[in-house]
Swiss-Prot record:
Homotetramer. This is Argininosuccinate synthase. Belongs to the argininosuccinate synthase family. Type 1 subfamily. GO terms for molecular function: argininosuccinate synthase activity; ATP binding. SUPFAM superfamilies: Adenine nucleotide alpha hydrolases-like (SSF52402), Argininosuccinate synthetase, C-terminal domain (SSF69864). L-citrulline binds at Y89, N125, R129, S177, S186, E262, Y274. L-aspartate binds at T121, N125, D126. It is an enzyme of class 6 (ligase). Its EC number is 6.3.4.5. InterPro entries: Arginosuc_syn_C (IPR048268), Arginosuc_syn_N (IPR048267), Arginosuc_synth (IPR001518), Arginosuc_synth_CS (IPR018223), Arginosuc_synth_type_1_subfam (IPR023434), AS_cat/multimer_dom_body (IPR024074), Rossmann-like_a/b/a_fold (IPR014729). It is found in: Cytoplasm.
Length: 400
């Protein structure tokens, strides 16, 4: 008896997910495989991927467009949260996984499948993200993960696919594992596994090397409404157009490269290369606008929330009650995060050079050291005495 009758497979057209189709049918006795490819702005020829799944043995090959949903339902909340895993990674790949899982569950329910499947291995984070998201959305569905169990080396996996007539795109001269969507691009494996070796330029695709960036900086004004980016340089833009334009501009100036040693949930460290031009600029600009419009206490408290929020996304807990509760807090903080931030993009750096908001808490008459100073300097002495009183009493007791 097979492990399932009908399975919906998250399909990318790569080695592992392509091999999953014959493996599910011939090794695990699955009667029918429905391949689901999701358009996340990766720029792939989805018609070719759709046809490849059918050649590999899928009974159906479906494509779902989800670029808009990825940005509005996943990236925008992350921007409001200034979400950076370990203070560096803006979660471009991790944010896409709960969306793919949601679509897997929806299609499985539509076609009457009793299981869903993915091509994640047993060493990565994505297996956790898929399994937990699917369980949260439909705990009755089985989750199959052939690549986690089949025990084949990369070479054996390729050979298995070739046995069933599946063309393999990975070449020995380019052995990187790539993930791409409109939020960013990740690369790992190959020579990148040498943590002490500088990544070759061929690893990058969205950003220019510093030597090839323009000598003159570019300036861009980003408009936010309640923490959501809505326009560039005075022009209102939809989410997709905004990301496309900012990815192009920031990438041209070499902005958004990340080379980091990352702590995976499964307990290992991994060397990851990310390119997230627009997402990094937006998070930085958003934080600058918050500095202008939020109170000190809210900003300082939100730092801890942002760290937890980022960890939840990274660790596959997007659909958890805690993430939803934190979202409620974050949304409440964003009511006044409306305004415009001016960023300078130059030689790999994005620097804020101006910010304005109708809800600005910055008061020049209180901040100035020149004429027009309205700060009551006489109040400082009493404030300092009361503020330091506990320390003063402690010192009297312990130091005489």
């Amino acid at each position: 008896m097979g492990r399932a009758k009908k399975v919906v497979l998250a399909y990318s057209g790569g080695v592992d997910t392509s091999v999953c189709i014959p493996y599910l049918k011939h090794e695990w006795g699955v009667e029918s495989v429905v391949a689901l490819a999701v358009d996340l702005g990766q720029g792939a020829e989805l018609e070719a991927i759709q046809a490849k799944a059918l050649r590999a043995g899928a009974e159906q090959s479906l494509v779902r467009e989800a670029v808009q949903a990825l940005i509005t339902d996943y990236a925008f909340p992350a921007i409001q949260a200034n979400a950076l895993y370990e203070q560096r990674y803006p979660l471009s790949t991790a944010l896409a996984r709960p969306l793919i899982a949601k679509l897997l569950v929806e299609v499985a329910e539509e076609v009457g499948a009793d299981a869903v499947a993915h091509g994640c291995t047993g060493k990565g984070n994505d297996q956790v993200r898929f399994d937990l998201a699917i369980a949260a959305l439909n705990p009755q569905l089985k989750v199959l993960a052939p690549a986690r169990e089949w025990g084949m080396t990369r070479e054996e996996t390729i050979a298995y696919g070739e046995r069933y007539g599946i063309p393999m795109p990975v070449q020995k001269s380019s052995p990187y594992s790539i993930d791409l969507n409109i939020l960013g691009r990740s690369a790992e494996a190959g020579i990148l596994e040498d943590a002490d070796r500088e990544p070759p330029e061929e690893v990058y695709a969205l950003t220019r090397p510093i030597s090839q960036t323009p000598d003159e900086p570019a300036y861009v004004e980003i408009e936010f409404e309640q923490g959501i980016p809505v326009g560039l340089d005075g022009q209102r833009l939809g989410p997709k157009a905004l990301f496309e334009q900012l990815n192009s501009l920031a990438g041209l100036h070499g902005v958004g490269r990340i080379d980091m040693i990352e702590n995976r949930l499964v307990g290992i460290k991994s060397r990851e290369i990310y390119e997230c031009p627009a997402l990094m600029v937006l998070i930085q600009a958003h934080r600058e606008l918050e500095s202008l419009t939020l109170t000190r206490d809210v900003i300082h408290y939100k730092y801890g929330i942002e760290t937890t929020y980022s960890q939840l996304i990274y660790n596959g807990l997007w659909y958890s009650p805690l993430r939803e509760a934190l979202d409620a807090f974050i949304r409440a903080t964003q009511k006044s995060v409306t305004g415009v931030v001016r960023m300078r993009l130059h030689k790999g750096q994005a620097v804020c050079v101006g910010r304005r908001s109708p809800y600005s808490l910055y008061n020049p008459e209180l901040a100035t050291y020149g004429e027009g100073d309205q700060f009551d300097h006489r109040a400082a002495e009493g404030f300092i005495y009361i503020w330091g009183l506990p320390t003063r009493v402690w010192a009297q007791v312990h130091r005489g």
